[in-house]
């Protein structure tokens, strides 16, 4: 069911830059450290307060999901561009996340690698989890956020692996938060992200099984 769980986003990763790992840096919040005299402690406190407000504002912005900007569906897509790379393609493949630098038709699965300005995400191809529109869109939104974050980075398999790894961690978080669950009807069921968590009701155990306290003999 590749067609059911795929998303294609436009990317601005650079094909011109050399494959240099040093060019890819995680986004960090810039902070200014100021050394002041004891008489200037009040100035430092004001700066710390302003920095805290900026960080809180940044956290609020991070909580807002990135709007989806899927590529418009194309017609009559044909597989092409593979010969230019000797039958290989730029990709990052993990258990639940497959990312390709190409446009993949969601219905016919035709693979057009000549459109390397697009990244296609195939989500959970083995259907290990149960997905609905909301949970799928959360993953797609996070994927879109990562694509935007790496704008200007070299288009290499290393960059795609960074994105894929972050998406895998995000899926794990969704599982632990109870936003998705294992598909018990999956063809292969091995709980790759840990066994399901089961909550027990201990009230019956403490009360002797019927919810009433036991009387002493």
Curated annotation (Swiss-Prot):
It is found in: Plastid, Chloroplast thylakoid membrane. One of its GO terms (biological process) is NADH dehydrogenase complex (plastoquinone) assembly. GO terms for molecular function: oxidoreductase activity, acting on NAD(P)H, quinone or similar compound as acceptor; quinone binding. It catalyses: a plastoquinone + NADH + (n+1) H(+)(in) = a plastoquinol + NAD(+) + n H(+)(out); a plastoquinone + NADPH + (n+1) H(+)(in) = a plastoquinol + NADP(+) + n H(+)(out). It is an enzyme of class 7 (translocase). Disruption phenotype: Malfunction of the NDH complex. Its EC number is 7.1.1.-. It comes from the Eukaryota. InterPro entries: NdhM. Keywords: Chloroplast, Membrane, NAD, NADP, Plastid, Plastoquinone, Quinone, Thylakoid, Transit peptide, Translocase, Transport. Pfam families: NdhM (PF10664). Residues 1-21 form a transit peptide. Residues 48-67 are annotated as: Disordered. Its main location: plastid. It is a peripheral membrane protein. Residues 50-62 have a biased composition (Basic and acidic residues). Coiled coil: none annotated. GO terms for cellular component: chloroplast; chloroplast thylakoid membrane; NAD(P)H dehydrogenase complex (plastoquinone); plasma membrane. NDH shuttles electrons from NAD(P)H:plastoquinone, via FMN and iron-sulfur (Fe-S) centers, to quinones in the photosynthetic chain and possibly in a chloroplast respiratory chain. The immediate electron acceptor for the enzyme in this species is believed to be plastoquinone. Couples the redox reaction to proton translocation, and thus conserves the redox energy in a proton gradient. Part of the chloroplast NDH complex, composed of a mixture of chloroplast and nucleus encoded subunits. Component of the NDH subcomplex A, at least composed of ndhH, ndhI, ndhJ, ndhK, ndhL, ndhM, ndhN and ndhO. Belongs to the NDH complex subunit M family. This is NAD(P)H-quinone oxidoreductase subunit M, chloroplastic. It comes from Arabidopsis thaliana (Mouse-ear cress). The gene is ndhM.
């Amino acid at each position: 069911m590749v067609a059911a769980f795929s998303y294609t986003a436009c990317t601005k990763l650079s094909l011109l830059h050399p494959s240099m790992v040093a060019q890819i840096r995680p986004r960090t919040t810039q902070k200014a450290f100021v050394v002041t005299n004891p008489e200037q402690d009040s100035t430092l406190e004001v700066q710390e307060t302003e920095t805290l407000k900026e960080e809180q504002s940044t956290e609020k912005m991070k909580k807002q999901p990135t709007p989806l900007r899927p590529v418009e569906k194309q017609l009559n897509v044909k597989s092409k561009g593979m010969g230019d790379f000797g039958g290989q393609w730029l990709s990052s493949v993990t258990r639940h996340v497959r990312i390709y630098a190409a446009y993949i038709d969601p219905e016919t699965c035709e693979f057009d690698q000549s459109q390397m300005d697009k990244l296609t995400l195939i989500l959970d191809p083995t259907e290990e989890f149960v997905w609905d529109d909301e949970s799928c869109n959360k993953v797609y939104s996070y994927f879109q956020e990562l694509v935007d974050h790496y704008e200007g980075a070299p288009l290499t398999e290393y960059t795609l692996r960074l994105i894929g790894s972050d998406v895998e961690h995000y899926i794990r978080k969704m599982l632990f938060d109870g936003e998705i669950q294992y598909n018990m009807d999956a063809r292969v069921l091995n709980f790759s992200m840990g066994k399901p968590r089961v909550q027990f009701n201990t009230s019956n155990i403490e009360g002797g099984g019927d919810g009433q306290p036991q009387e002493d003999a």
